[in-house]
Amino acid sequence: MKLLPSVVLKLFLAAVLSALVTGESLERLRRGLAAGTSNPDPPTVSTDQLLPLGGGRDRKVRDLQEADLDLLRVTLSSKPQALATPNKEEHGKRKKKGKGLGKKRDPCLRKYKDFCIHGECKYVKELRAPSCICHPGYHGERCHGLSLPVENRLYTYDHTTILAVVAVVLSSVCLLVIVGLLMFRYHRRGGYDVENEEKVKLGMTNSH
């Protein structure tokens, strides 16, 4: 029964010592975390120097501290990579966005700049092909054909018939004028001949 107070006292002292040691180790670990940005690998602390030898409880505390140190090393080594990967992802997204903006440009400005000869190019997204809006007087896929003006057949027919009628009328008028002149000359010549014959007859009678 006298041994029980001494055993309890020893256990209490061991617990106090372990608490002090763990407090110092945690303080050092916090300092290491504060300096972890400049030096990602924290200095290794030997648990043999921190904890006194002896007892299964001290060994358990030592194992827990080593496990905590390993976890801290893993977190410190993984934090810079975790910080670096989002930057890479953001940079990749920016590049993809830049490529997307380039794809949205009008292909008629660069690729199909000289596609339409006599017209304006217009890219049809549904067909994924360019089309041309031709200037007046041109036709074709690339506005390369010259379209001649088409005359109205009815108009040309009326025009030719009018010209033919005018020509016939003018020719008939000319013929009538010529016939009239010939008839006038013939009648005048016939009257002159009759007068001459009468004069000849009168002269012959006077001579008898």
From Swiss-Prot:
Residues 1-19 form the signal peptide. The record marks E141 as: Plays a critical role in diphtheria toxin binding and toxin sensitivity. Residues 93-102 have a biased composition (Basic residues). Residues 20-160 are extracellular. Disulfide bonds join C108-C121, C116-C132, C134-C143. Keywords: Cell membrane, Disulfide bond, EGF-like domain, Glycoprotein, Growth factor, Heparin-binding, Membrane, Receptor, Secreted, Signal, Transmembrane, Transmembrane helix. Residues 185-208 are cytoplasmic. SUPFAM superfamilies: EGF/Laminin. InterPro entries: EGF-like_dom (IPR000742). One of its GO terms (molecular function) is heparin binding. Residues 36-49 have a biased composition (Polar residues). Glycans are attached at T37, S38, T44, T47, T75, T85. Interacts with FBLN1. Interacts with EGFR and ERBB4. Growth factor that mediates its effects via EGFR, ERBB2 and ERBB4. Required for normal cardiac valve formation and normal heart function. Promotes smooth muscle cell proliferation. May be involved in macrophage-mediated cellular proliferation. It is mitogenic for fibroblasts, but not endothelial cells. It is able to bind EGF receptor/EGFR with higher affinity than EGF itself and is a far more potent mitogen for smooth muscle cells than EGF. Also acts as a diphtheria toxin receptor. This is Proheparin-binding EGF-like growth factor. The gene is HBEGF.
